[in-house]
């Protein structure tokens, strides 16, 4: 598996300060995609042991909230097979940090409720290691810059542990409180 880029100290792709890994390879080809170069599975650099260790080291400070997996498409079967051991290791090293994943596939597709070409032998385990899944393809006609942590209004922020327990999609509830102050 290759990665297109890694963003350290990212604040756009999940709560808090995170390390975001943009994998290469995507078959969705959403019109208006912000990362078209990552559609190509051969784009970027190999996701080798040195890179994985660099990511693990970047997450050591207490102020790092976790990692986010983006793309490209993390749930393309080729990428899932490489990401699973990485996420397992991340969970072992940092059990109190979160793992977010952005996928053009929907919850219903990834859990096998509807047909999905991306489901493979590791899908269920990889899904079980996530805290939040931002699901659904980017839809340019539904693009909304006011949405937090997603690009179009069809996309959902799903609490994966609660969704797995309920056997149905459960929206992630943002604990962040925003307030304005006047004098």
Which residue stretches match the model-derived regions?
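N-terminal [4Fe-4S]-dependent radical SAM core
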Residues: 1-22, 31, 35-42, 169-174
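Conserved Radical SAM active-site core
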Residues: 1-3, 17, 35-116, 121, ...
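Glycine-centered loop/turn positions within well-structured domains
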Residues: 28
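Short glycine-rich, flexible loops that bind phosphorylated cofactors or substrates
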Residues: 76, 141-142
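P-loop/Walker A phosphate-binding loop and immediately adjacent motor/lid segment at beta-alpha junctions
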Residues: 86-91, 143-183
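Short, conserved loop/helix-junction motifs that constitute active-site signature segments
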Residues: 125-128, 151
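Receiver (REC) domain switch/active-site residues of two-component response regulators
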Residues: 131
